[in-house]
Amino acid sequence: MNEIVVKGARVHNLKNITVRIPKNRLVVITGVSGSGKSSLAMDTIYAEGQRRYLESLSTYARQFLGNLKKPDVDEIEGLSPAIAIDQKTVSHNPRSTVGTVTEIYDYLRVLYARIGKAHCPECGRPLEKKSIDEILQDLFNSFKEGSRIYILAPVATEKKGTFKKEIEEFISKGFARIEIDGEIYRLEEVPELDKNKRHTVKLVVDRLILETRNEHRILDSLELAMREGKGFVEIRNVDTGESKIFSENLMCPVCGIGFPEITPKLFSFNSPYGACPNCHGLGFTFEVDPSLVIDEEKSVLEGAIIPYRWDRRLSRWVAREIEKRGVSPHLPFKDLPEDVKEFILYGDDRFEGVVPKVQRWHRETESPEMKEWLEKNFIVQRTCSVCGGRRLNREALSVKINGLNIHEFTELSISEELEFLKNLNLTEREREIVGELLKEIEKRLEFLVDVGLEYLTLSRSATTLSGGESQRIRLATQIGSGLTGVIYVLDEPTIGLHPRDTERLIKTLKKLRDLGNTVIVVEHDEEVIRNADHIIDIGPGGGTNGGRVVFQGTVDELLKNPDSSLTGEYLSGKRKITVNKTRRLPYASLKIKGVRHNNLKNIDVEIPLGVFVCVTGVSGSGKSSLVMETLYPALMNLLHKTKLPAGEFDSIEGHENIDKMIAIDQSPIGRTPRSNPATYTKVFDEIRSLFAMTPAAKARGYNKSRFSFNLKGGRCEACQGQGYVKIEMLFLPDVYVECDVCKGKRYNRETLEITYKGKNISDILDMTVDEALEFFKNIPSIKRTLQVLHDVGLGYVKLGQPATTLSGGEAQRIKLASELRKRDTGRTLYILDEPTVGLHFEDVRKLVEVLHRLVDRGNTVIVIEHNLDVIKNADHIIDLGPEGGKEGGYIVATGTPEEIAKNPHSYTGRFLKNVL
C-alpha cells in the first residue's frame, strides 16, 4: 500500500475527517493556530503508530510501558512505526549535553580510550605502558647494536632519607651496584647519606652489550628491574649518555602517580570512575549565597535572617546566642561586629550557622517544592572549584589526542571539531583501530552541520538549548540512526532558524525522505511549504471553527486554486502582511556598552526607545545572549532592584527613560496541570467573582473562593480539584486517570449547581477563548482579557487547558496577553523571544497589529525574530553575525529594514529585499 489513509478522525476538534497521505513523501500539514494540525499529526497518526508498535511487543514488555489510549479515529490503513520529533522535549537534566543527546560523546569516549595518550596529572609528562617484549623491540630500534647499556631499576626520585634498609636488602638479594645522585657505587661502599637532602636512587640490575645473542639475558634483566623498580625500568646507553624510561603500568616515573586503566568509562562524567569527585560530574555545585539569606537593613529580631522568617523561634534562638556575646539583637545586621556576622552566617562547633543550615535543608529535604523554594531564593550555581566546570576527574582530563583532552575537544564548535578530526595525524596501526569509529563521529557531526547547528559545542548543556535547537539535534540523531520505512512526525522544525539555514534543513528533511521514510511536518514556514511533495491544509479557523480539511494536494494545485484556503491566498500573494511604511522615530535611546557574554565580541549596542526594534541574525549569532541573558537581567536589576545573574558588560546608559520592563519568553506558564490560561491571565478571578454574585450563590453564602479548584470547600476532594487522579507506578511514569467522583469536572456537586446563564463553573473552564468572549461580551472586566487572548491568536485555546499541554509559542502568547491586559505606563519596555513560533501567516498578521498597538502608546518593543513579515514591520533592526558561534557576536548592520536590505554583508538584508 503506497499511502496512509486516515478515516473518521475526531481527536480534539477534528470533524470526522478522512485524509490520504502518500508514503515516502515530504508531507506538510499547515493551517491557522488551533486548526487541528497537531491533533492530526501528533495525536492521531503518531499516537496510533506508537500504540500499534507497542501492541506488537510481548505482554511482559508491555507491562513496563503502560497502555496507550487509542485515538478517536475509525481506522488508519498503511501505518508504519512512528517517531515524533517535537519541540517540547527540551531536556531538564543538568547531566545532558549536546554530546550525550546525539550519542557522539559515547563514540568520543571510545576514541579517547583507544588512541588517547595519557599524561601525568601533576607534571604533564607523557605516560606509556609497554610489555617486556615491546621494550626489547624498542631498545633495538632506538640504540645501535653493540652499544654498552645499563639496565637500572628506579628506587627513589628526589626523596629524603638514608636508604640504609633498601641497600641492605639489595645486598642480601645479590645485587652489586647502585647509582645515587648520578654516581655509581658498589653496594658495600655506599657513603652515609644526608637524611635531610633529596636523593635520586637507582639500582644497577645489569651491564651488558646490546646484541641479538644477549636477548634472553636482557629479557631476564628487564623483568628483574621491573620487579625492583615497582613497574619501572631505565635503560641507559653508556656510549651516548641517552636514557629511556619504560613502565609496564601507566605511572609517572617522576611523581610516582599511578594512572587508572584507560577505558571508555574513565571519560564518562555520569560514572563515579570518571566524574569529578567534588561536583559528581555536574560541572557546578549548589552553594548558599550569604547575600541572599540576610537583609542587612533589619535586626535579627526584625527578621534579618530571611530563611528563618517563617519560624520566629529560630530568629529568637540566634538573638539569644548573640546576646551571650554582648551584642544587642536589636542592631541592624549591617552594624553588627564582623565576628558576630561571621558567627550568624557560618556558626561554630556548637551552633549551626544560617549558611550550613540552609545547605543541609537543601541536601536532606525530600520535598521538590522545598528544594525549588530554596534554590530560587537562597542558592546559586557556582562553577565547580575542583574541575573548573569540566565535569571529569584529573586523570580523564590528562588523556590527550593531538594535544587536546576530551573536554577541550567538546569545547570546540562542531565545525571546528570536524576540521580537527579530518587533520588528525595517526599511525597506520591507530588508523586500523579507530578508522570506522572516526567515520561514524564525522558523519554524525556533519548531520548537525546540515541542520544548521555548526555553532554549537558538544559540551553545551542540553538545558540551555531552545526548543528549535533541541528538536533539530534529535532530527540529526535520527538521520544518524539510518532507519527506513518509518513515519517521522515533526512539529515546526524551523523554529529559531534564520531563512539562510532553512534551505539546509529542507535538504535534511528530503534526505530523511530519500532513505525511504514518510516525513510529516507540521509547519508554517513558506519555504518548507513550497518544498513539500504534498500539502494538507486544516482549517478554516481555529478551535471549534477548525478541524476540517480545506485542501489536500501538491503546491502547484494549491497555487492554481488559491481561494480554497488562507494558506493558498498567502502563498499566491493574494493576501499579504502589509508593511508599516512610516517608520517611527525614537524619543530617546538605551546604550549598553562592552557586552562580551558568551560569543559577543565586546560590542556597544544602541537601542532606540519608543519604537519597534527587531534583533536578527543567523542561529547562534548571539541574539539571546545579548537580549535575554544580558540586557534583560541588567535592566531588571537596575529598575526593579532584583539580583538576576547578567552576562558580562561594562555599562548601561539611558535606563532612566523607561520605568517598567517585561520579558516574555517560551518557558511554560506553570509546571503543573493546575495552571491554565484562565488562572494565569487572572480572568478566572473575575469569573469566580461573577459566580459569587449570582442569587443562588448569595442564598447559600458562597464567596468567590468557593469556585476555586485549588481551595477546600468547592472543589472535589477526591481529586483535590485536578479532575483526575495521579496513580504512581513505582519505576514507571505516573499515570493520570479521570476522577471517578466528579468525572473530570474538578468541583463537588453543590458548587456545580450554581449556574450563570445556564452554565456552571466547570462548563466555563471547558469553553474556548472565542466561545467565552461571546458568552461574556456584556461583562467589560472579563471581555477585556479574553479580547486580548483572541487578538494574540489564542481564540481556540480552552480556558481550563492545563499549562503542561501548551506549546512554547502558546505559553508565550498567554504571557503576552497577560501583560497586555494590564495598563501600561507608556514607558514600558517589552522583550519577546520569537513570538511567531507556531503561527500561521494570518496569526502573524494579528500579532504584528498587537505589537504596533503597544508601540503606538509610547512603549518600546524588542523582538528576537527570524520571521521576515515581522522584521519588515520593525522601525529599527539590529543584525548580529555574521555567522553563529565563534564566528558570530559582532554587529553586522543596524537601521531601518530598507537600510538593512541594502547592506551587502547582512544575510537578513538579502532575504528582506524580497519582501519589502
UniProtKB/Swiss-Prot annotation:
Signal peptide: none annotated. Residues 308-566, 586-913 form the ABC transporter domain. SMART domains: AAA. Belongs to the ABC transporter superfamily. UvrA family. ATP binds at residues 31-38, 617-624. It is found in: Cytoplasm. HAMAP family: UvrA. Coiled coil: none annotated. It holds the Pfam family UvrA_DNA-bind. GO terms for biological process: nucleotide-excision repair; SOS response. GO terms for molecular function: ATP binding; ATP hydrolysis activity; DNA binding; excinuclease ABC activity; zinc ion binding. InterPro entries: AAA+_ATPase, ABC_transporter-like_ATP-bd, ABC_transporter-like_CS, ATP_grasp_subdomain_1, P-loop_NTPase, UvrA, UvrA_DNA-bd, UvrA_inter. Forms a heterotetramer with UvrB during the search for lesions. One of its GO terms (cellular component) is cytoplasm. Keywords: ATP-binding, Cytoplasm, DNA damage, DNA excision, DNA repair, DNA-binding, Excision nuclease, Metal-binding, Nucleotide-binding, Repeat, SOS response, Zinc, Zinc-finger. The lineage of its organism: Bacteria, Thermotogati, Thermotogota, Thermotogae, Thermotogales. This is UvrABC system protein A. PROSITE patterns: ABC_TRANSPORTER_1 (PS00211), ABC_TRANSPORTER_2 (PS50893). It comes from the Bacteria. A zinc finger (C4-type) spans 252-279, 716-742. The UvrABC repair system catalyzes the recognition and processing of DNA lesions. UvrA is an ATPase and a DNA-binding protein. A damage recognition complex composed of 2 UvrA and 2 UvrB subunits scans DNA for abnormalities. When the presence of a lesion has been verified by UvrB, the UvrA molecules dissociate.
